[in-house]
Amino acid sequence: NSQISLKWSLQSLLEIPTYLAGSYLLKKYSSLNLLKLSAIMITVQFLLFALTNDSNIIIILCVFQVFSTPLILITSKRLIFEVSPKKLRSSSQLIALSIFMGGSSLIIPTVAGFLSINIGYNYTLMVLSLFGCLAYCLIVLLNYLQE
């Protein structure tokens, strides 16, 4: 279906400006605040996905992608760099991103598939949006522990 490819194309294109503006955003805002913004936006995006049945609205909701994946990658790299010992920074980046990308690529489709079959797509999207809430709470905890 052309709408599926439009959604993924738009989503990918919208990420590019955020990657390009990454260093500016990190200078202007703290990594944890950007990460909190990402968690909120992912939560809202998934809740709105769950509440709509119109494929055109789903495509429009891809605008939220500007604030999600690119910010998560940029800020997580910065945070890992900051907390890693100097000698382990490269390895830390590699391991953390492997866990982040590989772990989520394994766990989320498995959980989403199971939930979709058992509770339906819309409820699955709502449940998955809770991961954004969990992430937000963990970011607040990390911020508290760093102070």
What does each of the following model-derived ranges do?
Residues 89-118:
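A late C-terminal transmembrane helix in Major Facilitator Superfamily
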Residues 1-14, 93-96:
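Loop-to-transmembrane helix entry
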Residues 33-48:
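Structural signature of the two symmetry-related core transmembrane helices
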Residues 111-133:
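A membrane-interface helix-boundary motif in multi-pass transporters
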Residues 70-85:
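Intracellular juxtamembrane helix-capping segments at the cytosolic ends
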Residues 12-20, 102-106:
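Residue-level signature of mid-helix packing/kink "hotspots" within the transmembrane helices
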Residues 18-31, 116-117:
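Helix-to-loop junctions at the C-terminal end of transmembrane segments
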Residues 50-62:
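Helix-loop junctions at membrane interfaces in 12-TM secondary transporters
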